[in-house]
């Protein structure tokens, strides 16, 4: 068995070549965004907004190549609220993971990235409704695009909860 690889995209040149990098080897499992180096390369701040295009481009490249997208760590170790807000943005943008640079970041990252029992139940309902054709769940339209997102939620839940021995670690 060979080790999986993660490539870090942390420069304007790397971002311009992101699709080529994503296709470089079948051992590549993920691309990780390097916010500090990217900001330095661009002459930008490390805040969310100045790097939104770069993050979005990396997530899109990962989607095209079926790789996991890993977001850069949150750098202010004293700002727990800022960390929670940023990891929520990461999830909303399509990142599958967020790097942590301190043990206090692991819990908030895991909480934001782990599907809740409610999200899992909704994903199951969406797939059941989608099997009937176009329909609605909780008043919201369901079509194949919504079903694909629901499948992703269930795949993440299955991957996370099939690896835990913790009796209270998995939603029902």
Residue ranges with predicted function:
Residues 1-172:
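Expand to "…catalyze enediolate/carbanion chemistry for C-C bond making/breaking, isomerization
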């Amino acid at each position: 068995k060979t080790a999986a690889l993660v490539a870090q995209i942390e420069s304007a040149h790397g971002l311009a070549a992101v699709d080529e990098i994503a296709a470089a080897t079948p051992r590549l499992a993920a691309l990780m965004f390097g916010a500090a180096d990217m900001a330095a390369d661009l002459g930008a701040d490390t805040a969310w907004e100045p790097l939104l295009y770069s993050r979005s481009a990396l997530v899109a490249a990962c989607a095209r190549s079926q790789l996991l997208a890993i977001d850069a760590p949150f750098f202010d170790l004293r700002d727990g609220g800022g960390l929670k807000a940023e990891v929520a943005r990461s999830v909303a943008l399509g990142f599958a993971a967020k790097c942590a640079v301190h043990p206090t970041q692991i819990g908030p990252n895991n909480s934001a990235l782990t599907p809740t029992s409610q999200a899992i139940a909704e994903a199951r309902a969406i797939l059941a409704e989608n099997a009937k054709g176009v329909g609605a769940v909780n008043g919201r339209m369901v079509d194949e695009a919504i079903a694909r997102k629901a499948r992703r939620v269930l795949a993440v839940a299955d991957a996370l909860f099939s690896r835990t021995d913790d009796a209270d670690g998995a939603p029902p």
